[in-house]
Amino acid sequence: MVSRAKVGAETTKGIDEPDRNDNTDDNGAGAVEVTEAAEDAVELTNDISTQLPQHGFLARFYTGLSRLYTGTGVFEVVGRRRLWYSVGGVIVAVAVLSIIVRGFTFGIDFKGGTTVSMPVSPGVGGTGAIEVAQVADVFKKTLGSDPESVVVVGNGASATVRISSKTLSNDQTSKLRNALFDAFGPKGADAKPSKQAISDAAVSETWGGQITKKVVIALVVFLVLVGLYITVRYERYMAISALTTMCFDLTVTAGVYSLVGFEVTPATVIGLLTILGFSLYDTVIVFDKVEENTHGFQHTTRRTFAEQANLAINQTFMRSINTSLISVLPVLALMVVAVWLLGVGTLKDLALVQLVGIIVGTYSSIFFATPLLVTLRERTELVRTHTRRVVKRRTLGSQVGKKNADSHVAAGTRKPQNQAESCADASSQEGTEVATASVPTVLSKLAPGVRPVRPTGTRRPTGKRNNVGRR
């Protein structure tokens, strides 16, 4: 019995020791590399699993949307920045071309002129739909030229017709007022027809120029302060990227006004400052996350600077979208109130420029600001050196991982042969009878009638000592 246990223990020891030696030799050379490579492999597996088709487009869309909401999305922005640069370049080119070719439709505040207003006549329906065409016809018959614009301002009993034209002399203004009174008979506050219900005002073009000059000064001061703040708070590359993004927003918004033909008023110019503030806020949100992710990035080789920046975009993607949607709601409400309820042109102009600016600012903060920051930072020696280290470490880790996988496969194919050879050696040393009893000890399946070998060590598996000599 003792010889059988002894042979079983020696046989087990002979079989187990080569495996331990192989593992020690394989892992001792690159333990750190294998550990980091394993972490990257797990992360890469998670990323790839999210990109595999999962029961149709809707399932993949829902999975991607849920990952964006949790900040773990894999939406590639920085890696495709050349595509976004191309899209942005086309948009800017169209905007600049429209500004050069079409120009702007300036309001009366910028080019000067005369405005004539009168209440909407109830006899024509009170809606102003027919009133506009009739007023334009009366204007042309009276003065021999078409008005620049005829619009209905307000709604209901407070609705008025506003006529805008080039600067008129006093005689022309008086003649037009008489013609409008004869054609429509507007009523005054006492509900009786009165010429006093028709009002006129001359607007000097210098007033619009003064407003524009003040807005330009405010814009320059705003950009300087923003550049100084971002440089002190973050870094100069973020300041350059943020200022370039705001110039992009201004150019595209101005191009939209020129292309569509929206009227440019002082409210429009003032609204540009509002959209710059919104664009800056949205950009700083992403930059703050980029700074958090890239803090001390040069001390690790897990991700490159570009990958950390792309992760920051994914983590703030839905926050930017939700912020934009929440900002659009009051702007749309302002447009509804301005157009359909009050008819106040100033509110409409202000809401319109804000709506266009919010859409453009959201796009630029996600697809332009951060990719431009990465492009600027990748020109520095620090980021280039760190990127080379990450690529080198990943290459080394993949090679070590492949070597370990090959060694484990080879060990798995040789193990049954080693067990048989060990059993043969044991049988030659102790005899056929002892060898026959020792083989079942190594293998997991015992032969019928053979008792299992009791462990001969001085410690139990639980760590307690055996009472040596006690039966």
Swiss-Prot record:
Recorded GO CC terms: plasma membrane
Bias (Basic residues) ranges: 461-471
Cited NCBIfam families: 2A0604s01, transloc_SecF
Biased composition (Basic and acidic residues): 13-23
Keywords from the named record: Cell membrane, Membrane, Protein transport, Translocation, Transmembrane, Transmembrane helix, Transport
Identification of the protein by name: Protein translocase subunit SecF
Record organism: Mycobacterium leprae (strain TN)
Keyword match Transmembrane: yes
Keyword Protein transport among record annotations: yes
Compositionally biased intervals (Low complexity): 448-460
Source superkingdom: Bacteria
Family in the record: Belongs to the SecD/SecF family. SecF subfamily.
Membrane topology: Multi-pass membrane protein
